Amino acid sequence: MNRRSALQACLAAGASFVASPALGKIAASDTTHELITSTITIDMHSHIPPDATVAAFPIKAGMKQAGLDAICASFPVDVVPRQAEGDWYKVYLDWVQQLKKLAKDSGIREIKSLADLESCHRDRIPGVLQATEGAHFLEGRLERLATAYDGGLRHLQLAHSVQDPISPTGDLQTLTPQFDGLTSFGRSVIAECNRLGIVTDLAHSSGKTLKDALEVSSVPIIFSHTALLSPVGLGAVPTWADNRLPMRLLRPDEAQAIAAAGGVIGVWHIFPTVSAYAAAILDLVNTVGEDHVGIGSDTGIAGAIYNANHRWPGQHNGFLHAVVGELRKQKCPPATIRKVIGQNYCRILRAVEQARDASHAART
């Protein structure tokens, strides 16, 4: 399947996706509660610390309070200093085992497919989709990606804030360019993600890396956590104390390129109020269209640090309840809200699975 036919198939699938009974029909009453409970909801970028336990990180209660069926659970291995070959891979493997233990101990599910995600929604049992923030754990060994897939990885972000000294995938938003965009290894990683059925996430990657990735990938990609480089987006209040905010935002032409390729852009949490956060979502919707925007909070769903359910001053409702309530207040149509809070990411997941299946069929 070539890139054009894959994109056409993805968009066609998206058209039928909204009407699928398993994905939640338009409710008779489009209240905040109805919108959330009748739609598959997912946060495309959420953090779970490597030492998370049920007592310190009550994930099931946090997700239910938030109104989320699922989160893409991520951890950036590059925050751990690398002393020797294999260090980052071990950090990754240890985190995966801790994530699996947390899920089991908490009574939530591991999500490895769109069907699993649909089951979480139908059964009202939250789930985690294994993700990783940065491909550093590969350490130049592409075969580790298939092993990671077998272990449950379904969402790979190519880069993070530390440039990979062993096997860089491309230039980063916040560092001086070194590679003129996507590297040959980055191209191989994207191709392998397409083959295996792993969502490719370009968050933290530079504009040139993004452009190259869009040309390489046979399926739509996501940019999980950012906002638009606009007066609205620049109203964010970063958690870091330097001038990197404009670098982390997508230019309108970059956002439109992602949308033109069928992709989805997630809006992160770093706005001073839920009103400003909702405005940032609508800013993107007005720029790229309702089919290409999602939730990528870049928070934790439980615990004491960056808890999504206590993100903004005066927030009395769970994360998604607060966001959907504010979107309704700002006159966002119910159909658009449904797409943003989950249907768009589900469309990407379906496209990735279909491309994987087509690739496997072509080789047999």
What is each of the regions a protein language model found here?
Residues 2-175, 229-364:
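N-terminal hydrophobic targeting/anchoring segments and the immediately downstream early-domain regions
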Residues 220-226:
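Short hydrophobic/aromatic-enriched beta-strand-loop microsegments
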Residues 179-214:
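Loop-centered beta-sheet repeat module
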